[in-house]
């Protein structure tokens, strides 16, 4: 009673009551699921959960949380100061971001089963943090879903296994790994098998379905190939793979390197993106031709449009999928004792042609972006490629005629006559193209776009100001 009158209550409308009840049910379901997950992890011997996210490089970061506190972790209890990491656009005075773990990405660490890793999405003040790499990809996946597509992705993981040497350098583990053409050498693969076997077992334990692995074209270089997945899952797996490979290598007195090109006279490590779109409802591969293969390359009309979009934005994309100064030492015609770098140099496409930015493998039904290297942030790389491809579909872009020939054999004049553009020659050119491309800003959002440009310009400037041993050796006593 107030002033002799009954106080009126704000009675919710029936629809609001239903929504409130739905939220309570959802909350109860979440609690039940979290409790079940907690029990599952405890039974598996897990002591700590890692609420993870990535920096601008796609390197996993996180805190260790005792499983007893899993419930609060799943609700975003773990807060992070973004300013402490490379390329996360926050100031030291900004509020912390919260990592919301994705239980679908759970991986119990095979090298230490006391640990469980969760990829996470960053939130700020209860809303998705726009500059979170994983959120950037999720936005583009949502755009694809609105068009009726699921984006499938397979990434080939090329990397090096090295040991530290007494002189402070590094070398391949095997003393037999010294061939000029070491690709597919079973002897050196056997010498590295203790590491590779444990790594492949770990990948299969996680359900990745490894179907081959081999010694690659550089000394100490290896590749693992495993089944494709949706782009978010595959990006999570690449981030986890880099951590896992290093941890397993350390157990054997070695280290894994994901530097794109550690040797000037050897091939570099790619992370070729094998891509297709599937019908969201039926799962049908929409890149498989059904009477609409315009150039007899083994892909559909929609795949040609997708390819055209990627090529249109190829220079900007390069800044993201070849993100380091060292990346552009890989994207050259010559620079390997084996006779070829196997890396793309031109923004064009062709069937089963490894000299193009976009290759269409022999079986068709997918396209492969060969410019991507193993140092990429897969969330950002796949987000920008997907956005470019979707633009190509929406606008019906024409990819032009394919190039089946070895593009390395053409002179600069012949390349120009055909209207073919080079990929950026260095990180500076790539970042300039990224900054000038409106699609890059649209995909990344204002804050992450500005942060990426600023960080990469700084990286390029730092390299430009460095005096290398090559310069000293060449010029110190020349004049």
Stretches with model-predicted labels:
Residues 1-27:
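N-terminal amphipathic/basic-hydrophobic helices that include classical n-h-c signal peptides
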Residues 227, 234-240, 246-262:
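Gly/Pro-rich turn-and-neighbor structural signature
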Residues 113-115, 154, 217-219, 268-272, ...:
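Short, solvent-exposed loop/turn segments at the edges of secondary structure
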Residues 55, 123-129, 188, 228-234, ...:
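A generic structural motif
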Residues 158-170, 215, 219-229, 259-283:
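Histidine-centered divalent-metal-coordination microenvironment in nucleic-acid enzymes
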Residues 16, 24-215, 234-237, 254, ...:
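ATP/Mg2+-dependent ligation/transfer catalytic cores
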Residues 247-250, 254-255, 278-479:
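Catalytic-core signal marking the mid-to-C-terminal active-site face
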Residues 186-190, 212, 229-236, 262-266, ...:
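Alpha-helix capping and helix-loop boundary segments enriched in small/acidic/polar residues
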